[in-house]
């Protein structure tokens, strides 16, 4: 899975657009072995030292379910399989593209977190939050997207202001290509 250790098998409950892992040992394992999810009782965790449940995004949940690490159920206890998770996200037209990028980065050994606070799709770490700063912010595009040059300048300025490299991730089928921009001063 590209992680530093193998998390123990976990189970969670699908609630809205996330999966909640309530078993603390399972939650800690998922977080410590890849920084999956967000502990609900800690704003900025410094490791797996938390006592509450773990909230996983649907992207994280699908990835972990595909890897056989996470079993998902509905609140009534009925099982939610991998295909059911894919069906649950059909309302988001960008989900497939985002998931392909997420999976590709995870398989390359990166820790992938939400990039919302940076105005992008993902923040990508080499080691993990609290250990190092995310050197990259990644935004997903399809080959059909028209990118305004002003958007490129905006992305460059934003990434420079937060000391990160801005990466365009473009998906074609299941393949992902990356283009990184950086400031150049002659």
From Swiss-Prot:
Q: Which family does it belong to?
A: Belongs to the tRNA-intron endonuclease family. Archaeal short subfamily.
Cite the source lineage: Archaea, Thermoproteota, Thermoprotei, Desulfurococcales, Desulfurococcaceae
- Documented EC number(s): 4.6.1.16
PANTHER family (alphabetical): TRNA-SPLICING ENDONUCLEASE SUBUNIT SEN2
Q: Which NCBIfam families match?
A: endA
Q: Which CDD domains match?
A: tRNA-intron_lyase_C
What's the name of the protein?
A: tRNA-splicing endonuclease
Q: Where is the active site?
A: 125, 133, 164
Keyword vocabulary terms for this entry: Lyase, tRNA processing
């Amino acid at each position: 899975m590209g992680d530093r250790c193998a998390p123990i098998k976990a189970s969670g409950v699908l609630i809205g657009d996330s999966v909640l892992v309530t078993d603390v040992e399972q939650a800690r394992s998922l977080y410590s072995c890849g920084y999956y999810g967000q502990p609900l009782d800690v704003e900025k965790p410094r490791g797996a030292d938390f006592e509450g449940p773990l909230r996983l995004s649907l992207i994280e949940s699908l990835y972990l379910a595909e890897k056989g690490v996470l079993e998902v159920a509905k609140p009534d206890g009925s099982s939610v399989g991998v295909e059911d998770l894919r069906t649950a996200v059909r309302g988001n037209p960008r989900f497939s593209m985002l998931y392909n990028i997420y999976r590709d980065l995870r398989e390359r050994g990166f820790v992938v977190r939400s990039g919302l606070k940076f105005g992008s799709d993902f923040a990508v770490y080499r080691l993990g939050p609290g250990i190092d700063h995310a050197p990259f912010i990644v935004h997903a595009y399809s080959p059909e997207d028209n990118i305004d040059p002003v958007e490129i300048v905006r992305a460059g300025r934003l990434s420079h202001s937060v000391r990160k490299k801005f990466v365009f991730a473009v998906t074609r089928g299941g393949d992902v290509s990356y283009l990184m921009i950086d400031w150049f001063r002659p």
